[in-house]
Amino acid sequence: MATELTWHDVLADEKQQPYFINTLHTVAGERQSGITVYPPQKDVFNAFRFTELGDVKVVILGQDPYHGPGQAHGLAFSVRPGIAPPPSLVNIYKELEASIPGFVRPAHGYLESWARQGVLLLNTVLTVRAGQAHSHASLGWETFTDKVISLINQHREGVVFLLWGSHAQKKGAIIDPQRHHILKAPHPSPLSAHRGFFGCNHFALTNQWLEQHGEKTIDWTPVLPAESE
């Protein structure tokens, strides 16, 4: 059953913690000193803006944001309209083509329509320096996103967690498998997709689970906002 609690309700205290204030301060300081940080400040918390706590049905965990120009906008694996889908997302699309009847790979990589259906696209680190992968690891974001996962675990039931790769699987170790449905596979990156991400069937299995539990299934075809109006 959907909870009426919002992210604001459950995260207000966390956002007052010294570590979190320090994280924001460090990131703001880098931006002010002229370092390019992705995503833009206004997009850092988009995962929570597009998917309210009470609407979360599925969680897909990423690592840190894309670090190329114009890519990251606060949703894991997603890129802005007009930016070519990166290799991991191309592999996600390949798996969707293989497992979801009628799925046609889009030319874009903008996944907001997933987020608006209850798919929380959560990176474990929410910012990155331009061109430097993992440059904001250990700034405190991991503590914050651990808290987010524990709050979903506590306040929601029957959420499907898609944990791709060892990083996501370690991060998801706190999830109670009695309360939630956990699906694991290798990461969709070209380095590991052939080791079991292809053929994992996670998108079809997610919809099966949702249907069995009386929830609306996810339309996995990403739609640009203008197309959905």
Swiss-Prot record:
This is Uracil-DNA glycosylase. Signal peptide: none annotated. Its main location: cytoplasm. Its EC number is 3.2.2.27. It is found in: Cytoplasm. The active site is at 64 (proton acceptor). One of its GO terms (biological process) is base-excision repair, AP site formation via deaminated base removal. Gene3D superfamilies: Uracil-DNA glycosylase-like domain. It is an enzyme of class 3 (hydrolase). Coiled coil: none annotated. Excises uracil residues from the DNA which can arise as a result of misincorporation of dUMP residues by DNA polymerase or due to deamination of cytosine. It catalyses: Hydrolyzes single-stranded DNA or mismatched double-stranded DNA and polynucleotides, releasing free uracil. Keywords: Cytoplasm, DNA damage, DNA repair, Hydrolase. Belongs to the uracil-DNA glycosylase (UDG) superfamily. UNG family. InterPro entries: UDG_fam1, Ura-DNA_Glyclase_AS, Uracil-DNA_glycosylase-like, Uracil-DNA_glycosylase-like_sf. HAMAP family: UDG (MF_00148). Pfam families: UDG (PF03167). One of its GO terms (cellular component) is cytoplasm. It comes from Salmonella agona (strain SL483). One of its GO terms (molecular function) is uracil DNA N-glycosylase activity.
